């Protein structure tokens, strides 16, 4: 698992290889990842936007931005957690992802919460990027 803490908001990521959706002979490698966001702060926040930097084994970078996560913009009161799962396909057997969430307080203050860098490694492959 990979962890990051920003302003008492913790992001934990657990990536996993999706062998049944991958086809190495066709250069298709797919990972899922489970993310748990815990609001350990004293204020409520809403996850407004996301930013991902996805880098494959060859250094090809794909930047992804958009509103919320998996179609939601969850509000986390102090002590709340929010969990979701998503996925990422690559053309190479290894990669790296990191990013941030843009959060907004009830007072309208915006700030970024780090998503830790995490490896996407095919089973049996030595770690290349992390």
From Swiss-Prot:
Record-level GO BP terms: error-free translesion synthesis
Domain ApaG: 3-127
InterPro entries (alphabetical): ApaG_domain, ApaG_sf, Uncharacterised_ApaG
One Pfam family matching this protein: DUF525
Cited PANTHER family: F-BOX ONLY PROTEIN 3, POLYMERASE DELTA-INTERACTING PROTEIN 2
NCBIfam families: PRK05461.1
Record protein name field: Protein ApaG
